[in-house]
């Protein structure tokens, strides 16, 4: 038994660490594990690791961090800091594990690379933003800035590396 979250994705992104902690307490009561796809793998990587460690500390649940990596250029050099934090949590008696996939790639929905302000009220709001010429221009400008002031998984990467790989309807192209 366990619980898995995708905190980079909507609607999981709306859960705060206190809610996660309370849910993880239930998981712990059944001897389960809490697996987290952390809130950030980009600009706020260390803070996202700290959030996972906080949940472990406060709930007593075993925690698995999915896809632990320092892939984006802004995070190069942060691995030792990340591992020290995990080791310190383990030294305090917390069960913390992590996994990592063996390739250099990233996959997400288009929603995840949009500025926070453009998606904060869900998909319907994002569609309305994209239909508005002025707001669409602001989205493009914000997505083109590097470094971003929001957690953009594309920050520091080149757009020619992006591959669109699936659509529900041809009209979405």
Task: Give the label of every model feature segment.
Residues 18-61:
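Extended hydrophobic/aromatic segments used for targeting, binding, or gating
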């Amino acid at each position: 038994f366990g619980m898995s979250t995708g905190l980079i994705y909507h609607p999981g992104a709306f859960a705060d660490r206190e809610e996660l902690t309370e849910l993880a307490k239930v998981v712990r009561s059944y001897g389960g594990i809490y697996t987290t796809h952390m809130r950030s793998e980009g600009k706020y990587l260390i803070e996202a690791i700290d959030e996972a460690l906080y949940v472990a500390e406060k709930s007593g649940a075993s925690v698995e961090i999915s896809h632990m990596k320092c892939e984006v250029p802004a995070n190069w050099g942060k691995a030792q800091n990340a591992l020290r934090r995990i080791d310190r949590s383990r030294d305090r008696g917390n069960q913390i594990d992590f996994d990592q996939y063996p390739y250099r790639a990233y996959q997400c929905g288009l929603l995840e690379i949009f500025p926070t302000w453009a998606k904060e009220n869900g998909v319907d709001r994002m569609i309305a933003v994209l239909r508005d010429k002025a707001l669409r221009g602001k989205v493009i400008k914000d997505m083109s800035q590097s470094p971003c002031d929001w957690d953009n998984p594309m920050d520091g990467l080149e757009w020619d590396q992006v591959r669109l790989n699936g659509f529900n309807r041809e009209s979405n192209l």
